């Protein structure tokens, strides 16, 4: 049994989380990675207790410690690169080191033509912001990730450095996509330019599209409404109860004995007096219910609910425990538990974790057998051309995967029915303004570009038989329902492999295909809640907070990475396989630090709000209404610049602020100084003044301003597409540019319901009369029933 990426050779010149997580995913899939470190080592070695996070991100890699300032050190690195397939680096955009170290494109083409190079930076290698100073907080602020999560509190960032893992996931996706292009461009370096800023934008639920829609209807463009109930306190802890449809809300009201609030969902979501009245009556009932009982009751009613797991409780969660997801790692005397691989491949499973490299690693590293590089007839602009994808996805996670494949050339056929269309069509259903409302929802459109659409009633014999015929001809089948859904139709892997032995099937259940909770309802919010993402987000003295949805595209990215590895395995061996991506395991994989830290210290770290462990920073109200600025003071030079901007040079050498440690010790007083000045200026003015002096700062981004960003314009992040009903709209692209590679992000707008029925079914050999009969029997159709 070989690994999916057996023979793939990767050199990593990266630190902290994003680049190491990118290559960690490749290691999980069987690639061989050499991590290059300078003598001082990756700073992550000293982050947190026992270096556990470094061990997690760098397990199984070879180590090469060199002084890149010396010619002998560079020669060693160049020797490794000359034999590699992929180089992953995270040097700042425009860094002089890239040229001095011979890592620029021209130098690399002399060393290794045909190399894939993944360059990770904050804003990308080009554009007016490419050299702008930033920190994880200010990047989150710029991308709309710092927002109001708790009524009455300042907007707050996502915790536990989750966004950095997201960037690493996209970098792995870029690497494997560029690898397919390199089979066409064998004598050229293929570069993937990954923007962390764009990666964070790419995981948002299309707020720029929603803002345009709300404005067109005369409504405020930046809605702060969040699904009810959200995260609430029960008898013995926090629980997430998530009403993502109108039926969920009615069921929750009935469950709590409060049916009179069934007609007031929107008013309660928006925080009016109805909200206070509702919770005054709901909280006593919640206080009487243990979390476990409330989760079980809610799930029995098909209401998405989950406990709020932290680094301790997640280890005792029945679903994770039954699936043996957390594994032992670390050296003797410092053992800890960490997440396992975030995907399971039936024919090429990930092995047990191996140790991370020690600093001062071997002078030479011997690669194992290299990868065979067969020439491809594909076009570099469409690296997935010829790939047939049968898309049984619903909502966001699976649809995000198939949208990506279709963008770069795959023929994706999405299956819905006029009786039960993709539930994403109902997202934003409160905005119904025409008979075709189900065709124009921002979330539906954004996740279903680049596809063809057929409708098949799978409850009918004729519809199910046609689905099986489509699956029999597919290279890849994708689904992300609860496990029992495709199994009851006989469309699971064991059934499909009998009619299509080489098929690769990707299953993306919320909770996994096995375990006591496998049939629980899994939506993004309760995935975030169960996996620890919510527990680390928010203020120390407040409740855990939802991230509002990124778990879906994060799972989609990880599933795509696993699929591309499986396609590489099939290229070499002809063998298909089943890929299982349990979304709760992806969530835990990108929230690794809390469980690692707890298992090393037996302590659960408090939520950190907007603070950082090593320097002072925060989010502050500016003079405008609901206008906020985020800033970080990384060092004494930043602090000196801040004192000049706020007109308090006397504070530069104040003992309370004279060093990073002093500023952390007096963070409350630091906040007061910044807040007092921020309240007198617009957020944009304050941020620009700080940026002009080299201090990381950003005005908090909102949906209605996301189309007006010079950096995104310069990099062509948005793309206009004409929809037959919605007209021309601008859609976000993917957070990387591959050169040589695709010149466009998307190939076609989202399809209308059943738009390609005649085309797809005709290709199966059905006559026009047979197709007409199917339409008369409502096996297929082009209009939603009971709309």
Which ranges hold each PLM region?
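N-terminal helix-loop segment corresponding to the beta1-alpha1 unit
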Residues: 1-187, 281, 292, 329, ...
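Terminal low-complexity tails and localization/encapsulation signals of metabolic enzymes
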Residues: 1-9, 233, 311-391, 615, ...
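Short, well-structured beta-strand/strand-turn elements
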Residues: 33, 299-313, 412-415, 691-705, ...
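Glycine-rich beta-alpha junction loops
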Residues: 40, 122-124, 196-201, 236, ...
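Helix N-cap/coil-helix junction residues
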Residues: 103, 258, 320, 491, ...
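Conserved Rossmann-fold dehydrogenase catalytic segment
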Residues: 125, 153-162, 183-200, 218-224, ...
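Substrate-binding/catalytic subdomain of NAD(P)-dependent oxidoreductase enzymes
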Residues: 178-219, 307, 311, 566-607, ...
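Aromatic-enriched alpha-helical interface/lid elements that frame and gate functional surfaces
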Residues: 223, 227-301, 305, 616-693, ...
